[in-house]
Amino acid sequence: MANEAYPCPCDIGHRLEYGGLGREVQVEHIKAYVTKSPVDAGKAVIVIQDIFGWQLPNTRYIADMISGNGYTTIVPDFFVGQEPWDPSGDWSIFPEWLKTRNAQKIDREISAILKYLKQQCHAQKIGIVGFCWGGTAVHHLMMKYSEFRAGVSVYGIVKDSEDIYNLKNPTLFIFAENDVVIPLKDVSLLTQKLKEHCKVEYQIKTFSGQTHGFVHRKREDCSPADKPYIDEARRNLIEWLNKYM
């Protein structure tokens, strides 16, 4: 788990200059970014933000990448108008900031988004992908909502509790070897719990030499050594959705 002195040392990394292919919409009480699939296959993916919010271009880039593979994607504002974390902010107040943005208390928003995807986008199969804060949300949601056909949790903090294994549908977990937010002992705990108790398909992948945020907050060309891992993780994400949706 993250330490108290630096409770969630998430570096915003390389903020992409990216305009996006989708559009912003209002879904009941939530703003959201939606990208329609070029092929109407009746499949949709909810992409859940990290602590830097739903408007981060990097997250929208990933949503558009997923959309290009046959899925309508939606990036809702799960902070519901509250400010995202400022990367230059005082990390000592981060725990207090986080208390009003609980990744396990987004059921009202999920209900609204599911209704929108089914009624307005004609989605018959729905999956979820989330990063950091959103990765934690994905883990929680995959234990609660059986209608999510597949989930991908990307460096979501692992909660040390007895029910972390009770997944309802196939879930992929992506971690980074050198993640100071999520130590490898937490990944080992999750691995042990799932191996002992999980009754659905799952996979845990830890990427060598990588750090928190590597999948969606690094430029593809930022380092020749990192690029293969970024590409592989993104490919794994798409392959998991394709396999189970």
Swiss-Prot record:
Modified residues (Phosphoserine): 223
Gene3D superfamilies the UniProt entry points to: alpha/beta hydrolase (3.40.50.1820)
Positions bearing N-acetylalanine: 2
Residues recorded with modification N6-acetyllysine: 36
Subcellular location: Cytoplasm, Cytosol
Enzyme class of the recorded protein, top EC level: hydrolase
A Pfam family: DLH
Tissue: Widely expressed, with highest levels in liver, followed by kidney, small intestine and colon. Present in liver and intestine (at protein level).
Entry EC no(s): 3.1.-.-
Any Gene Ontology biological process: xenobiotic metabolic process
Spans traversing the lipid bilayer: none
Reported regulation of activity: Strongly inhibited by p-chloromercuribenzoate (PCMB). Partially inhibited by bis-p-nitrophenylphosphate (BNPP). Not inhibited by DFP, PMSF, eserine or EDTA.
Entry GO CC: cytosol; extracellular exosome
Source superkingdom: Eukaryota
Entry annotation: catalytic residues: 132, 179, 212
Function: Cysteine hydrolase. Can convert the prodrug olmesartan medoxomil into its pharmacologically active metabolite olmerstatan, an angiotensin receptor blocker, in liver and intestine. May also activate beta-lactam antibiotics faropenem medoxomil and lenampicillin.
Assigned protein family: Belongs to the dienelactone hydrolase family.
Protein name (record): Carboxymethylenebutenolidase homolog
Gene name linked to the record: CMBL
